[in-house]
A protein has these predicted regions:
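Amphipathic, positively biased hydrophobic alpha-helical segments used for protein targeting
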Residues: 9-11, 60, 330
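Compositionally biased, intrinsically disordered low-complexity segments enriched
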Residues: 15, 43-45, 335
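Bacterial N-terminal signal peptides that target proteins for export
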Residues: 1-8
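A metal-dependent hydrolase metal-coordination microenvironment
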Residues: 23-149, 153, 161-162, 166, ...
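Charged catalytic cores and adjacent phosphate/nucleic-acid-binding surfaces used
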Residues: 2, 21-38, 57, 115-125, ...
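Hydrophobic h-region of N-terminal signal peptides that target proteins for export
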Residues: 11-19
Length: 359
């Protein structure tokens, strides 16, 4: 008896020590909001994934995420010979672990159909069993009745859209007309669909990016090829489930994948400004000025198309600084650049104006 009692604290200590390595992410912010790092599309053994649900929480914590959704398929259970079909099981198993790790666990499911309509995640649902319906529209209706955020997943996935080009079908237009579609994956797994930027802009939908992980995340997005999984950045009033949901319906989202950020035009400029700072010129030789440009984020900023009298291209490294030497005229007018890795449309990147700080 005595032996058992002493074993308990040692076991707890080992558990805490093994899990105590969270990566802190530095990403752009929107003034007045907190940036929540999120992955809203992942699978477990309860559909076609290969991991137990609580592993998703540990992975998310180590990866520096704030919120996740486990979205097992409603209509596809390849492991059912060994694991019973239970659409709430993953959420039930992962919930207490999420509470221990301070991870916001959104309850979700993936409605899984042929294209059209394809695959759609229902997020913030309460009763996944109610989505088990032959009629697709009835399944979405049931989700929406629970206050769901409906995300159209990987619309250009080659298994369903062989040329990789996403297309809106009548069923998607019908969903939009009813107010039953709220976001589209611009980025999924390791691929992205440029036209989704325009679809979201034209239809007032949130742009989303998720891992759609089925195996172990650190193996599917392994270093050195990947420094982080693809994720949705959500600009919420607070770090709570309610604020997260409000922000998503209000379309305050961006997608971070590789060294790129995809964001709606109206959010892109403030996001860039939140991490890039131009210093006061520290040298002036009467013809040219020298000033520093620094970046506090994990995302290098790749500038091109600079005007005459300034560098044509500049990369401000992640957590780094460069010195800009430019014509003195830029004391009175901004230096203009395209930011090649901040994507605002299928054919557009962010344009910025940079002015050295005033003395
Ligand atoms: Zn999926």
């Amino acid at each position: 008896m005595k032996t058992k009692l002493t074993l308990i604290p040692i076991f707890l200590l080992i558990t805490l020590t093994l899990s105590a390595q969270r990566h802190i992410l530095s990403v752009p912010e929107l003034p007045g909001y907190v940036t929540l790092k999120c992955d809203f599309h992942m699978h477990t053994v309860f559909s076609d994934g290969n991991v137990w649900p609580n592993q998703r929480v540990g992975e998310a914590w180590r990866d520096g995420l704030d919120a996740i959704a486990i979205t097992d398929h409603i209509e596809y259970q390849p492991h059912k010979q060994y694991i019973p079909v239970d659409h709430s099981a993953a959420w039930k198993i992962a919930s207490p672990i999420a509470a221990d790790y301070n991870i916001i666990l959104v309850k979700g499911s993936e409605i899984t159909r042929k294209m059209p309509p394809g695959h759609l995640n229902a997020l913030f649902i309460t009763e996944p069993d109610s989505l088990v319906k032959d009629d697709f529209m009835k399944a979405v209706e049931a989700a929406v009745a629970q206050g769901a955020f409906i995300e159209w997943n990987h619309p250009g996935w080659k298994s369903q859209q062989p040329d990789g080009i996403p297309r809106m079908y009548d069923v998607h237009r019908e969903l939009i007309a009813k107010g039953w579609l709220h976001g589209i994956e611009y980025y999924n797994d390791v691929e992205y669909y440029p036209l989704v930027m325009d679809m979201c802009r034209d239809n007032q939908l949130a742009i989303m990016g998720n891992s759609d992980v089925h195996g172990v995340i650190s193996e599917e997005f392994a270093a050195p090829v990947y420094s982080h999984r693809p994720m949705t950045l959500v600009f919420a009033k607070e770090r709570t489930m309610e604020s997260l949901k409000e922000a998503m319906f209000a379309r305050r989202t961006a997608v971070w994948y590789g060294d790129n950020l995809a964001a709606p035009e109206e959010l892109a400029a403030p996001l860039f400004q939140s991490v890039i700072t131009a210093g006061i010129p520290f040298r002036d030789d009467g013809k040219r000025i020298w000033f520093e440009l620094s970046n506090t984020s994990d995302i290098p900023m790749k500038l091109s198309g600079g005007p005459e009298g300034a560098p044509a291209t500049l990369t401000v490294p992640a957590h780094g600084m460069v010195v800009v030497r430019a014509d003195r005229k830029f004391l009175a007018q901004p230096v203009t650049y395209a930011v090649d890795n901040i994507i605002t449309g299928s054919n557009n990147v962010l344009k910025v104006e940079i002015s050295p700080a005033k003395k």
